[in-house]
Amino acid sequence: MSALIEKHPFKPFLPPGCKVVLCGTFPPKPEKWSMDFFYPNFYNDMWRIFGMIFLGDKEIFFDRDKKRIDKEAIQKLLNSEKIGIGETVTEAIRTRDNASDKYLEVVKMVNLPELLSKIPDCNHFVTTGEKAAKVIASLTSTLVPEVGSKTECEIKMENGIIKKFYHWRMPSTSRAYPMKLEKKAEFYRHMFEEIGII
């Protein structure tokens, strides 16, 4: 029996005037979702970090009783701050029945020129984990940045123009990543400050 190739379930969310796009690898299986949007697992810390940084409340997007995440409120914030969300992997095989990047076999990577052509004001690409960072480093023939740092990259666009952008590597927002929520939030806050979002 051949391995099942899965397509990424979400299309990139790219607000008009998007200045930065955050990209991970692959979401968990649908039975683990608390909404149908990026970082859908109730126990992933991405939207807690956003709540802390932008609204001063890490639980503002979470309904603990219903185990739901407020997608509409998140998208409203992303639109307001001109922050995009996408992926580095568009097709993958789960070699084990979980969401760990360790057991994710990349089949197809994001088409960077195509993605960046949709967001001409964006000069910052943020990866939210080691595997995502390695994908972008591979696509741009650059070194993988250290956590919290950035690398300058160049990519040849579909029209032949060379576009420069910065690849930032942030800590994974998975609970399995050994770093306290507050420390993760410090990395993300610094990155948003450097970019000029906050």
What are these language model-derived features?
Residues 13, 75-78, 117-118:
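Short, conserved, surface-exposed binding loops centered on an aromatic residue
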Residues 31, 35-103:
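Short, surface-exposed acidic-centric catalytic microdomains
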Residues 16-17, 121:
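Short, well-ordered loop/turn elements at secondary-structure boundaries
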